[in-house]
Amino acid sequence: MSLSPEKANELKQIIHDHLIKMDIHGKIRDVLTETVQGDGHHKQCLLSEEDFMHALQRRGIVNDVMKDLHFTNMYNSHTEADSVNKSATHFMDQNITQLKTANIGQLKRQLYLQVVGGKAFLEQLQEPEPLPGQVCSTFTLHVHFRNQRFRSKPIPCACEPDIQEGFLLEIHRDGPGDASKMADATTMLSICDPVHMVLIKTDTSGDTTLVSSYFLDWRTVLSAPNGKISVSAELLGVGAEAKVPAGVLNLKLELYPPLTETLSPDVVTMQKSLERQKTAEKERLFLVYAKQWWQEFLDIRPSNKSKLVKIFAQDENGVNRPVCSYVRVLRAGRLLESPRQAARFVSLLAQERAPVVGGGVRQEQWASMMVFLCRNKGDCEDHATLLCSLLLGFGLDAYVCVGTKVKNIPHTWVMTCGTDGSITFWESFTAHRYLHRPIDPDAPSMILQPKPVHPYQTLGCVFNHKIFLANCQVSDAVERCVFDFTDGSRWKAMSEEAVRSVCDPGFNTSLPPTPPLCSSSLVPNEASNQLELEMRYLLSEHRKDLGLATVWDDHLSYLLSAALSAYELERCAGVSYGNEEFQDAVRRAVPDGHTFKAFPINFLHCNARRAFATCLRSPFCEEIVCCRGDHVRLAVRVRVFGYPESACAVWIMFACKYRSVL
């Protein structure tokens, strides 16, 4: 039986609620404990997944689940008109899938992280109570641990949110050939990777807000007598509210299979203390070096003090970190096929400056990569560091540039150096690429100098995950810069060893772990069809309010697909194709004496009402939507292109053909 995504998600939700209600986690835990303890030869023979499933069946757990699970006739309760009237935000809130699943392997140690509710989210007291049936704001918890990512289902925002989720995290070894071996207590104690928990709030319009970014040190469970421990994680706010409590999550940690010998609490505490001391000493030494390096940079030329040389930046938790630590070599696997497609993906993540209370200068906040991906929006620094990380993953010599753009506005972008000496600038907000052509200040005045086509004015420094270089040329104007990084008279470099000591995860255990990219949860064809139905409904209702009838031309709508596909390919690859075929097809579809008009527009979201309201602000689109004349035929086509991390490029084209009435 094939179900639509909405019905499938509704079915999953019913099953999930039923399992929570009957405390399936507790029953499975009891059966596992009884099976392990009751097996007389468990020390010589490890419990397999098949044995455990047989144990569940023998104790009737599976039968109990199926016996108490009842389904009502939910499939006939929604009509097509109802689905058209729903907002796109409502559909997106339901379209939640677990990003990564794991099975209990007989040779792998697992950490079961269970969230059993929250409390003291006092800011939610200011939120009005939603009306029955009204879409409300939701919390979503994202979890990252050692290259594994999960997210919870959306939970209605409340002072005491009912977050009931379990995440099975695999504790694997790093060494080659060791991944299949069971990690013992000593090995796990040396694994200092925290569990990164990011709490996101999504409002009724689909806008996301970062509530908290929390790093959980899970190793306290290694000293628990029975391999179980309950903890309360106090979440703090972000940015200016980094020291203000945002709420508390109640957590349960449990190891599978349990340890035969637990560690002493003093041993775990001592290990954490030694790691903190080691990290603090490295950071102190780097700070001393950075101060000395900065003074040497100022001694070269007093005017260097005014250049934008960014050595440290604050993250969402108010922690000062070297800027090089925000860049990683990030490989996207099969999710992105080329550097230009990576640039397109980054440009689809929305722009948003860090929120600030009150007026004044711009609040600068560099988000860790996990936070940026979960929130799906950020400032120029977040976009630039992510794009640089992806370009490094594709094997390019990429750097983040810190400087200014037009009107002397501070800005961050990306630069790549070709093997032939060419320099290319990448604008992470738009995915535009600019070839750098420097101006020769010593050239005779009669020689025509190249005019810059990029929007960048000055450049203070460049960096990636290994290298930090400050611009010590006489002028920091971008068009005059010579990018010969081996020339010490033009670029002052930091010691690569010093940078590595605080920016390499292998040397500094306090750095946030680098998350993998996750595939899109969107089904492009279904999302396109749904959004197109909603746009047709909104356009028809708008014309009805104006006293105009609406007659659709389905063939003309279909022809618009070719243009939308070409637009997205041009954004990705920088080349256009198929325009001649599209124009020829339109000419054949429009009779003599008729006029054809079309209006394409690009969005980063699937909210039909927001998109339609934006389109009506354009006089060209309004002219098409409100078209009057003889034999008026309307067409609308929607194409949704899915990208990693739920990013999407939504292309909408409105068109009409009519015979003018003079």
Swiss-Prot record:
Q: What are the recorded Gene Ontology BP terms?
A: regulation of centriole replication
An annotated GO cellular component of this protein is: cytoplasm
- Which InterPro entries does the protein's record reference? CEP76, CEP76-C2, CEP76_C, CEP76_N, CEPT76/DRC7_peptidase-like_dom, Papain-like_cys_pep_sf
Q: Which UniProt keywords apply?
A: Cytoplasm, Cytoskeleton
Record keyword Magnesium present: no
Q: Which residues cross the membrane?
A: none
Tell me where it resides: Cytoplasm, Cytoskeleton, Microtubule organizing center, Centrosome; Cytoplasm, Cytoskeleton, Microtubule organizing center, Centrosome, Centriole
The entry assigns this protein to a family as follows: Belongs to the CEP76 family.
The entry's function note states: Centrosomal protein involved in regulation of centriole duplication. Required to limit centriole duplication to once per cell cycle by preventing centriole reduplication.
Protein name stated in the entry = Centrosomal protein of 76 kDa
Organism, scientific name: Danio rerio (Zebrafish)
